[in-house]
Each structure stands twice: as C-alpha cells, then as structure tokens.
Amino acid sequence: MFKENKNKVETIIKTSEEAPSSRLNGSQRLKESGLILAFLFSIFLAVALFSFNPADPSWSQTAWGTDIHNAGGLVGAWLADTLFFVFGSLAYPLPFITAFAAWVLLRKRDEGDEIDFTLWGTRLLGLTIVLLTSCGLADINFDDIWYFSSGGVIGDVLTSLALPTLNILGTTLVLLFLWGAGITLLTGISWLRIVEWIGERSIAAFVGLFNRLRGEKAERVKPALVKPELPVEELEPTFSASMDTEIDEPAPSLRRFNIHMPEERDVPDIHFEPQVEPKVELKPEPPRQREPAPHFSRVAAQNTQVEPVSSARTQQWDATIEELEQQARLVDDYAVEDDAVPSVLTSSTLSDVEDSILTTAISVDEEEESLSENFNHSFNIEVEDEEVEPSIANLHWSDDEDELEETPSVMVSPAIESDWEDEDEPDDRDVAAFQNIVSQAQANAAAQQNPFLVQKAVNLPKPTEPMPTLELLYHPEKRENFIDREALEEIARLVESKLADYKIQAQVVDIFPGPVITRFELDLAPGVKVSRISSLSMDLARSLSAMAVRVVEVIPGKPYVGLELPNMSRQTVYLSDVIASPQFKESKSPTTVVLGQDIAGDAVVADLSKMPHVLVAGTTGSGKSVGVNVMILSMLYKASPEDVRFIMIDPKMLELSVYEGIPHLLAEVVTDMKDASNALRWCVGEMERRYKLMSVLGVRNIKGFNDKLRMAAEAGHPIYDPLWKDGDSMESEPPLLEKLPYIVVVVDEFADLMMVVGKKVEELIARLAQKARAAGIHLILATQRPSVDVITGLIKANIPTRVAFTVSTKTDSRTILDQSGAESLLGMGDMLYLPAGSSHTIRVHGAFASDDDVHAVVNNWKARGKPNYISEIIQGDHGPEALLPGEQSESDEELDPLFDQVVEHVVETRRGSVSGVQRRFKIGYNRAARIVEQLEAQGIVSAPGHNGNRDVLAPAPIRD
C-alpha cells in the first residue's frame, strides 16, 4: 500500500535527522547535564576508594588533629569508609558500575531507540544477585582488608544465616550457583552454550590427538574430511554476495509486503493429493479376492468411510473442484470394473451365482429388458448392455434385495420370455416412450441422491455432547502475526509529513496493529481542531495510497485522535477463533452473540438480552448476512431449545432457510411477507401474556420469572397458570406454568417487509422494541437499504444498538449510527458497533462462518431433536376477538372526508370507477382508490370484474 511512497519516506527521515542536530531541547539538556555529573561522581568515588587510608577520620573511627591522607578529602574518606564497611572488597567495582548505569539511562537516544524496561529490569536483578553473592563468597574465602570484612556487612549477614545450616561447602555451592544465575540475568550469557563449546573443543582436541597417534590412517582420513568442505567454502562467497546484493536493494519493502504468505497457504494442497489417492486406490482392492456378490455394496460403504478420514475439515475447505472430480472418476472406474465381473458370470453361469446387484437391476428393468429382447433376440447380450448402470436400482430397491436373492437369478429370464411370447409386438414409438419414462425415473432418483444437494430427511446419529463442539467449525492453520516495526515507523513519519503538508502539526504517539487495520494515535498541537483532520480523510487516503482512511475524533480515555489505515495483507477472523476465546466461554447468558475481533485482535461478544434489540444495516456484499448467521450460530452454541427459541423471517429464501428443522424454531422459516405480519402480531400477543404472568408473580423480567418457578418447584409448590379459564382447554384443571424461553425474532431483509406490508409492521416492531425487553423477546433487524423510509425515527428511537457495515455515503452512515464513519469501512465484515447507551462506535472485524460451518451446526441440532411448531404464529386469527389492545380492524378505519360526497356522486351517476372519482373531485389516484375500496367495504359498489369495471349496488335516489 505504501510502496510508492518509499522514496518520500526516506527523504523525510533524512531531513528530520539533519535538522535537530545543532541544539538540544529541554529534556535532552537535563539528561546530558546529569550524565556529566554522574561521570564526575564516579571519578571522585574511584579516587576516594583507591586513596583510602584507615588513619583518616571517618564513620568507623575518630581522629583529632591529624592530616587527611585521602585524595578526596574528608568527604572522600567518609564515603570510602562507608562503602568498605557495607560491601567490603566489592566496593572497588562500584565506580565503574555507576558510570555505566548513568551512560545507559542518561545518554542521548534516537527517536526510535526506546528503553526495554523488561530487559533492564532483569539486568538490574542480575546485578543485585551478583553483588550479594560476591559479598558472601568474598566473606568466606578472602582475608579481611584493614579492619573491614572482605564481604562487608552484606557478606557477614549472608554467611551468618547460611553457615549454621549449610556449612562452608554447602554455602559456597549455593552462592556459586546463584552467582551463575545472576551472571546469566545480567549479561545474557548461556552457561549451557559454554559447556557445549568446551565439550566440542575437548572432543576435537581428543580426536586430533588420536588421529596424530594413528599415523597413516589419520592421513587417509584427512583428505576425505577436507574434500567435502571445499565446495562449501567456494559456495559461501557467492551466497554471501547474492545476499549482499539483495540487501543493497530495498529490502524493507520486501518484508513489508509479506510475499511468503501465499506460498505457505499452497503447501497443504500439495500434501492432500498423495494422502487421498492411495486410500481410494487401496480400499477397493481387497474385496476383489472375495465373493463377487457383496463386492459393490462393500465398495460403497468403504467410500463413505474414506471421505471423513482422507479429507479432514481443513482439507475440505481447501479442496478444489478438480480434486473432487478426480476422486469421483476414480470411484466410478472401480464401480465399472466391479460391474463387469457379474456381467461375465451371468452370461456363463447364471444359475450358480447369486449376485445382489444384478438381480436388483433386473428387478427394476424387467419390462425394459423384455421389450428390447423381442427386437434383439438375445437376452444375454441385452443383460451385458444394460448392466452398465445398476447403481440407481441398488440404491432404491435395497429393501427387496433379500426377497430377490431367495430365487435363482436364472429363473428370471424364462419368466420374462414366457410372458412376452404370447403378446403382440408393440410399436417402436411405445417402446421408445416407455424407455424414456424409465430413464427419466432413474435420472430423478439419481438427482435426489446427489451428495451436493441438501438432504431434507437424513437420519443422523444423536450426539453425546450436551452442546455443539468446536470440531464442527473450520479451524484455520496457525498464523504468525509478523509485524514489521520499521515499516510501521516509516508509515508514521509519512503520516506526520502529509499532515504537515496541510499545515497540521501532529505527532504519532502510539501504533496499534490489528488483523485488518492499524490505528495511529496522533497528538495534535495546541490549537488544532479535529474537524480539520476529519475533512481531510479523502486527501489523506489519496496521499497514503490507501483504500480508505477513517478518522476517530474521540478515543475514550485518551487525549489523542485516531487514524485507521488498512493493512497490506488482511487476515480473516474465523468464528472458531472467537468461540474458543475466553470472552465467549466466560459469558453465561444464553443470548450471547459473537461479533468478531476489535482492532487489537481481541474477541468482541455481546449479550442480546442487554442490547436488547439490534439493527444491522449495510450495502449488498458488505457481510451483513454473514454477521447475522454468526449471531445465530453463537446462540446455538450457548443455548438449548429450552432457553432460546427463534422466529426467522427470510424474504430472500436463502440466508435463513438453512435453519429449517432445528428444534429452536417456534415456526417454519417465514418466506411470505404476508405471514410475517402474523408472526409479529403473535409476538406482541405473547409479550402481553408474559407481562400479565409476571405481574401476577410479582417479578420484573423473564429471569426473575424463571427463577421463581424453579424455586417453587424445588420447594414442592408448583405454580399453576393464573390466566387459565374454563374452556381454554379440554382439561378441568389449570396447567402448570413452564419455563419461558427467550424469543429472538430475526428479520433478514427489513426493507422488503416494510414495502410489502407497510405501516402495520412498523407499529408492531415499535411495540416490541418498546416493551419486549423484560418479556424476553428480542429483535435482530437487518436491511441493505439504510434509508429514512425504512429505518424510521420511531424504530431508531427504540433500537439503540446498531451495527453498520460498509455504506456508500455519509448520509447512510448517519441514518444508521447518527454519525459518519461507515462509508470508510473496508467491506467483507468490517463493521462499526454502537453499543446501547453509548455514542462512541467500536470498530469490529466480523467473524466469518462458511456454509459448511452453518450446515454442520444445523445438522448437529437436527440430530438432537425435531422442532415443535406453533401453527398460530404464521396462520394467525383475523377475527375481532384476536385483535390486540389498541388495535383496530380494517373495517373500522376512518372514512375519508369526501366519502359522503363520493357516495352521492356514484349513486347518481351509477359509475364507480377510480378515474371518475379522481377527475370529479380533483384528488390523487391513491386517495381515489382508497375511497373506492371503502365504498366496496360498505357494500355500495361491487368488486372489479374481469374488465375492471365495478357495478353500483346501492339503489338510485328517489326523485320527486
């Protein structure tokens, strides 16, 4: 992305390094002054220690009227005496240690040369250990200096504590090993490498000495050892030269673009082919040595078992169509070879061999073979010709195979011949028509058994795990997060320079690289407004050769401005990574939904019960449907059908229809928008019923309701339904209250629902969004048309949680989020998440779930149980008793103010057309059509006939 600007970056770096070389700033002046004073103190300390005289007055003794012999004077005598008293002979290295520490801490550094506090912390720990152990060793092994202990007070304390328990030898060993560990922490020297080096040198010296003693044999061995090394030595200069030439070229650009990443992805494809082919070739061979009758069925069974073993979940993801076709050809070749064996046997010894495949094929094609037998006069030849495709018959008539095997196959042909010898020969057209019917039936059977089609009724084994496992999802290979610090620093300098071109002074203070984007946090100079940078987002994207640049005006908790740039190589966030994260595992709510990962790569999950409703919007292809599927799959990983139930509305009949048949569904997936209003009306009625139950029990939400039911059941006092009345059911006693599950209503395309049904849907959704949170009913609304007529103010006011994918304009972004930013997203799951009660958006890279992942989880739940659909959800009840509180029927709508005048006009003129009403009263077509529909509802005019005309049913007025 920044390859074209590399030369500009280098010039910026050079100018920035040459400019500040004359003067030091304030902090650098203080550091350099402190460094000079530290060197002066180190020199003074060394002079005082090396010129120490025990006769000088000091902290240890007092002298009166004597000359001071220490070169540092009275201060030097006191300082040296104190250090000798504390450290003993280990006081001599202290001046050098002080000077070195001052140089490390206070010297002038480059802008990119930062202090690694972890490294220097370990070095400081190592230095402390070395000083303490050295004092202890000196106290044990060395004589005292003057009247001071050789290890000082520190050595005396350590030895007095260790000698009573460890003795001299044990104390020495412990201190020596601690001293070695301190040296490793201080210098980083590996004692193991030193031991290996000493061992290698010792072995080499021993081998050389042994070869010299061997004489002539040693001379024979030397040329054999030297010759292989010569070409290596000759190749080394050429290799180093080539490396030098590559290094002289712009090497950082090569590292920046990560060219080696696609090569690593192609490696698994090379290993898949040799792993699959031998298994397909070797499996069918052993049955050939056995009986021919069960051969084909065993091959089919083995083929079904080979597929999961030879192609794992990751291999299925990377497999190509060519590989699948090649494997299919191999299986077909073996099937043809197996079919050739029974055909030869039937022609020679049909009465001695009982072949299940042949008899099954003959049972299906009896009539076809008998018809063609009259024209070819050779039954055996016809069997060989028709024996090519017995697989369809074997699949469909496997249940009758045992009955057919009881009779010898040789008895079939005489029966067929005797039946058709007495009849007349049919016409060629009848034979051709019958053959077409048979071939079409076989083709339909083959199409139903196609493995690439979705099987509606599949008997799957019931899983033993209580919830779906991670093995159902695709697991990507381990990816190394390579971060090029030099490239990031160059980009940071480039950002600063481009902002300087627009007269904006800013400094990059923090860089946060992520899987998709990298955020640069800018510290603006005093007086610079954030709006200036926001208005330059397009210009910055052009200057930085980036696809889009997003400006984060406010970062919570920081006084900086964020600048988000897309990475050169984008990583895919998979659903398995987020579900395996601790954030998802630690969440206890059954309505936990997965969103993806933030810019730092951390998992982002949310609780739908706290949202409590979410609006998902974005253009076509931005990842909106994948995001909705990820939310549903995450709840399927957390909740059982007793905890969460779904009502899914899918106008496109593609995205949510795959969930048909899971036990979580309350009704079939709604694909007709006219039924969608009934489903929403049922949700409103269920919400009202739940509120009545909660008011009777004295709880405030669904969690308290379920907890109270559980406590009552544990106490032995179950609660009966207080809203039950006589006649509601066939039972004489009210039923017990059961646990209420959360209900999640998922609408994949909300705009289509608004266009078809209209204002009623908006009112129903508004009622659910206002009151349904405590009742445990939550909405997930998705739309690809973020316009104000779809996302109305009434809906936005009641759905505070929004998720915006890529949109085309700032207006659409403001429609969804009430702020701009979504127009700068990168697509393919890149989203802005606005939590409830917050005005700051969070950039999230949406998790990806493939179709295979969705089918795997859905089949896992289908194997656990079947759904218990409620028919009233879709069918509804349009009677007056089914009206919700505050709802009016269509007949109770207010009549138009011109209704009476239109009635008078229609009755007099005896014409009830819409165009006539429109011309007479000079109104719009929609209003005129509405008035005519009201006339039809009142029985004044009839319904339109086949020609569109309406008859006036009301009698004409009586004239005097």
Curated annotation (Swiss-Prot):
The UniProt record lists the keyword S-adenosyl-L-methionine: no
Cellular compartment(s): Cell inner membrane
Entry's family note: Belongs to the FtsK/SpoIIIE/SftA family.
Membrane topology qualifier: Multi-pass membrane protein
GO cellular component: plasma membrane
Swiss-Prot/TrEMBL domain comment: Consists of an N-terminal domain, which is sufficient for the localization to the septal ring and is required for cell division, followed by a linker domain, and a C-terminal domain, which forms the translocation motor involved in chromosome segregation. The C-terminal domain can be further subdivided into alpha, beta and gamma subdomains. The alpha and beta subdomains multimerise to produce a hexameric ring, contain the nucleotide binding motif and form the DNA pump.
Ranges that cross the membrane: 35-55, 84-104, 117-137, 145-165, 172-192
CDD domains: TrwB_TraG_TraD_VirD4
GO molecular function: ATP binding; DNA binding; DNA translocase activity
Stored PROSITE patterns: FTSK
Cytoplasmic side: 193-960
Role of this protein: Essential cell division protein that coordinates cell division and chromosome segregation. The N-terminus is involved in assembly of the cell-division machinery. The C-terminus functions as a DNA motor that moves dsDNA in an ATP-dependent manner towards the dif recombination site, which is located within the replication terminus region. Translocation stops specifically at Xer-dif sites, where FtsK interacts with the Xer recombinase, allowing activation of chromosome unlinking by recombination. FtsK orienting polar sequences (KOPS) guide the direction of DNA translocation.
Name of the protein this chain belongs to: DNA translocase FtsK
